[in-house]
């Protein structure tokens, strides 16, 4: 009973809203009716005659001055609107109407309960705007030597931008170096190698670091006669040098895996020694932190090599062990690698368990988290989903949950559906991504498109429902539905991260505002009138009088274009065309 009453109230509310939407048409007809009734007391005909007499006394110079002034004003408005649109990405007139006029006209709900929540949300969104525009390391990034360079050799295009590679160099310096590197010659060489821009110079420096370590081991081993094995452990090979060679010199994934295994032996020894000495001072603590980053990076890349080579179960085991051993290192986002590998195994129950841990309101979201959750819910209903049947009987609870999950994912990153539905071509993902941006969409779709295709009907459900998200967020830059407003900075950052041959997806689409088009048309029209009036003042004056007479006459319904030109000919007294004369011999 209560549900029926609630439904009736909702229908009544929708009817009232609909009636207010079209109330202006009723008001318009009422005004026309009042004007018709009061035409005699208001002396409308006399007033129109007076206006007509006044306009007839105007000279062509007045029209020239009027059109010239309006052209100047329209041109100034056009220039200002164009400058404001280029600088801020929106029309000034539209911005003023949305910010100031729409609240006065009742376009914003001013309930006190909503105001308190929205004010808190706005303050939080201001704090979040900086973090949302932060560039993140792509957890599924490819190998430069084995994948990016091979793409360059085949196509002749550079898949990585200088800005992206510069960010990677900064990450390497942060993860793989510390203040005490100058005490060890090999680490000092690698510290310079990470800053080197030339790839060949970096590779040469890595080989040099390995050779220096080898020479030092050969020289210092004979000095200790007691234990040769202990001395070799004291001087292990440089793990970061192997990392660089595996990333940039190896031309296949198998070669990269061999180098990473050598790096694991060296890195594991350094990690165990620094773990014992980490409490002896800040210098040893920094070394242990660096060795931890190196070890986690190596194990993660080894798991990715196993995934690339088809050993998916082995990769899943390595990722799980790594997450258990280092649970606090969330900066590598290893759970996203784990989700992708579990989807490849079609272990959807395990995927749901991982999502239950990481799809939390207190944790940062990503396209992988949101769209994987949407895929799991779509999987339950997509094989039987039909738009025609849903329109007849309505959506079931499971279908509604799937649609809401898709809307949630699309609101977080609206660029992904175009790549999943193959409406836009994919490129190699960059090494860094911007959350909610086009770069993140490419990185997600590059690895997860196959998983969506594997679930029957999932792409069909996505195709039928994803555009409905935009009806819930008509102003995504100002207010979101489930997330913070969409950040404005994504387009600029994505253009820096993605190569020039890729057309960056922009959301919301920046179409030229109507006011700019209207102003441009008005400016052009008035300028043309001014030019014609200046060149043909008498003809334009007669034409204007004829137009005024037609609009003010009682026979308005019978006018046509021929009557206009007949009046112009009568006023100018244009003589008829001479008849041709035939000469007879």
UniProtKB/Swiss-Prot annotation:
Membrane-spanning ranges: 15-35, 62-82, 512-532
InterPro entries: ST7 (IPR007311)
Keyword Iron: no
GO cellular component labels: membrane
Keyword annotations from UniProtKB, A to Z: Glycoprotein, Membrane, Phosphoprotein, Transmembrane, Transmembrane helix
Listed Pfam families: ST7
Subcellular location: Membrane
Record's keyword annotation contains Disulfide bond: no
Family, as annotated: Belongs to the ST7 family.
The protein's name: Suppressor of tumorigenicity 7 protein
Organism this protein belongs to: Bos taurus (Bovine)
Lineage, broadest ranks: Eukaryota, Metazoa, Chordata, Craniata, Vertebrata
């Amino acid at each position: 009973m209560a549900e029926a009453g609630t439904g009736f109230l909702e229908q009544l509310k929708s009817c009232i809203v609909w009636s207010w939407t079209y109330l202006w048409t009723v008001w318009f007809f009422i005004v026309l009716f009042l004007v018709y009734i009061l035409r005699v007391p208001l002396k409308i005909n006399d007033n129109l005659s007076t206006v007509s007499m006044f306009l007839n006394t105007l000279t062509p110079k007045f029209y020239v001055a009027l059109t010239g002034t309006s052209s100047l004003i329209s041109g100034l408005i056009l220039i200002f609107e164009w400058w404001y649109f280029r600088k801020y990405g929106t029309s000034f007139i539209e911005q003023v109407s949305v910010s100031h006029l729409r609240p006065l006209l009742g376009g914003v709900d001013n309930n006190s309960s909503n105001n308190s929540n929205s004010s808190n949300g706005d303050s939080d969104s201001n704090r979040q705007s900086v973090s949302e525009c932060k560039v993140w390391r792509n957890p599924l990034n490819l190998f430069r030597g084995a994948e990016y360079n091979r793409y360059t050799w085949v196509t002749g295009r550079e898949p990585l931008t200088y800005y992206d590679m510069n960010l990677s160099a900064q990450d390497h310096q942060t993860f793989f170096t510390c203040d005490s590197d100058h005490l060890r010659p090999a680490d000092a060489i690698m510290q310079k190698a990470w800053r080197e821009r030339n790839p060949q110079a970096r590779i040469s420096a890595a080989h040099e670091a390995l050779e220096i370590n080898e020479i030092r081991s050969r020289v210092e081993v004979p000095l200790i006669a007691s234990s040769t094995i202990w001395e070799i452990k004291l001087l292990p090979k440089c793990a970061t040098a192997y990392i660089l060679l595996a990333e940039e010199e190896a031309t296949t994934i198998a070669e990269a895996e061999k180098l990473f295994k050598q790096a694991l032996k060296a890195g594991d020894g350094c990690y165990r020694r620094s773990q014992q000495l980490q409490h002896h001072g800040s210098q040893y603590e920094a070394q242990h932190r660096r060795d931890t980053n190196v070890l986690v990076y190596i194990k993660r890349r080894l798991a990715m090599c196993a995934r690339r080579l088809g050993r998916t179960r082995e990769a899943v085991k390595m990722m799980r062990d790594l997450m258990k051993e280092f649970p606090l290192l969330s900066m590598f986002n290893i759970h996203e690698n784990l989700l992708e590998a579990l989807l490849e195994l079609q272990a959807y129950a395990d995927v749901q368990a991982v999502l239950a841990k990481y799809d939390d309101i207190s944790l940062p979201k990503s396209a992988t988290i949101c769209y994987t959750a949407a895929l799991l819910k779509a999987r339950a209903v997509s094989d039987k989903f039909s738009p025609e049947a849903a329109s007849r009987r309505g959506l079931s609870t499971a279908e509604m949950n799937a649609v809401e999950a898709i809307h949630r994912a699309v609101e977080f990153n609206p660029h992904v559906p175009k790549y999943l539905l193959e409406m836009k071509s994919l490129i190699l993902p960059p090494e860094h991504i911007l959350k909610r941006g086009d770069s993140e969409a490419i990185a997600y779709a590059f690895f997860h498109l196959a998983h969506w295709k594997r679930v029957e009907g999932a792409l069909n459900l996505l195709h039928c429902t994803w555009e409905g998200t935009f009806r819930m967020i008509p102003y995504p830059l100002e207010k979101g539905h489930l997330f913070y407003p969409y950040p404005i900075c994504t387009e600029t950052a994505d253009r820096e991260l993605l190569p020039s041959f890729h057309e960056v997806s922009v959301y919301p689409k920046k179409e030229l505002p109507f006011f700019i088009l209207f102003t441009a048309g008005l400016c052009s029209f008035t300028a043309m009138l001014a030019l014609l009036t200046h060149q043909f003042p008498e003809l334009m004056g007669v034409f204007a009088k004829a137009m005024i007479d037609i609009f003010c006459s009682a026979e308005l319904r019978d006018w046509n274009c021929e009557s206009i030109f007949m009046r112009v000919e009568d006023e100018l007294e244009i003589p008829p065309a001479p008849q041709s004369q035939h000469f007879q011999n």
